Amino acid sequence: MCAFPCSNISEMRLLFPLVLAISLSACTNVFFQPQQIQYLTPDQIGLAYEDVYFNSSDGVRLHGWLLPAQGKAKGTILFLHGNAENITTHIASVYWLPAQHYNVFLPDYRGYGRSEGSPSLEGAQEDINSAMSHLLQRSDIDHERIVMLGQSLGGALAIYNTAHSPYRSKIKALITESAFSDYRSIAREKLDSFWLSWPLQWPLSLTIDNDYSPLPVVNKISPIPLLIIHGDKDKVVPLAHGQALYAAAAQPKEMWVVEGGGHIAAFRRKEYQIKLLAYLQDILKN
């Protein structure tokens, strides 16, 4: 059982609000389900941290946590969380990395946690760029050893961002877990799964802004190494999304299918923590 109020305690908590929201409003912003509640702070689980405030390029005040590596840092992980709650729950996926000598920067998108503003796909892209810019302005971060890790919506955002980022030369690798391939496709799937919205799946999904979808741009990640992680029992974002992204991506690329794995659940398993550490060590060896 997870020691945190994780965002996927109940997968239906993610699925049902998305279905209902799309049915009612038919706009891309339904992909964002932010909360401002602070469930915990890193010191409550024995982690040192820094409260970081920085501005997005359009002036929105953003908040995040920097978890410093214990001992000499091997690198820095820029962690992009999923669509629900905020960093105070999603820390559950990365809390173990500082003990393995990695800094972790967890920004909240606008509208989440203590970040100001209202969430949007365009705004989230600005926020990711600003988070990267913040890291590159810090003297305590090795600017040549930054890896981006995105889960679920954060993975979809990360793919689009890395393909277009003004800082892509500083992204040593991109890792996604449970990322969906296309906003309209995932919307259709959720609408199809609920009897009330089933007849509306096609007309409503066509109202979704697909401009920021990862599938058309994932081939532009190259030559940055791409690792796609996906559970074969993911009921929120089916494995087919990860497979489609992998098929469309250019080399260098790698895919891990987590046997029996649900949504953003790989790093609950010690074996995948060990695999990730080995991957990071290999990527950052030069």
Predicted regions located by residue number:
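An N-terminal hydrophobic leader/cap segment in hydrolases
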Residues: 26-55, 62-65
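Conserved alpha/beta-hydrolase "acid-adjacent" motif
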Residues: 235-241
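Alpha/beta-hydrolase fold nucleophile elbow
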Residues: 141-152
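Short beta-strand/loop motif that positions the catalytic acidic residue
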Residues: 221-222, 227-230, 234
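Hydrolase active-site cap/lid region
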Residues: 160-217, 265-270
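Conserved alpha/beta-hydrolase
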Residues: 94-116
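Alpha/beta-hydrolase active-site loop
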Residues: 119-139
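Short beta-strand element of the alpha/beta-hydrolase
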Residues: 74-82
